[in-house]
């Protein structure tokens, strides 16, 4: 979901005193590719945002539609170009093992991302989380997530591609968060998939 503009400005305003006091250097945020336009970028520049990461996930329009992402590869290209034009640091986030996505599809996504010239990327494996549509598909046998080994091998090949083009890989895999672990009872919310707490 995209935050309302008023809420965005409220949150960004709260950080400004820390930037003025040099306690915080800059702001980094993640958003959907279809949330980026010139007006938003003007506003983000005003609030000292330096890095914008786009949740690309895949560059295959069929896979994006299959996963109900709500954006297209055209949205990714347009947003990436605008972000670079406005001189923000551009980051991309991609996922490996999306429904109907093959290793070839994931490699192609990495190659497409390279052409868009982000400074950094994050690579996340798809996990089946409790209470999601993907859990329903998994329970019906309509989705099989990657194993840890498959995710590592696939990610390894993708990391090599990025490193050959001097694009920093700043994360591979998800960090342990309240989304993954129920904060009250510390039970995992992960039903299946290549999750390793390391």
Residue ranges and their predicted role:
Residues 23-25, 161-167:
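Structural alpha-beta junctions
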Residues 142-164:
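Alpha/beta-hydrolase-fold enzymes
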Residues 96-103, 120-146, 167-197:
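Flexible glycine/acidic-rich beta-alpha junction loops that bind and position SAM and/or redox cofactors
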Residues 1-120, 130-149:
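Conserved non-cysteine loop/helix-boundary elements of the Radical SAM core domain that shape
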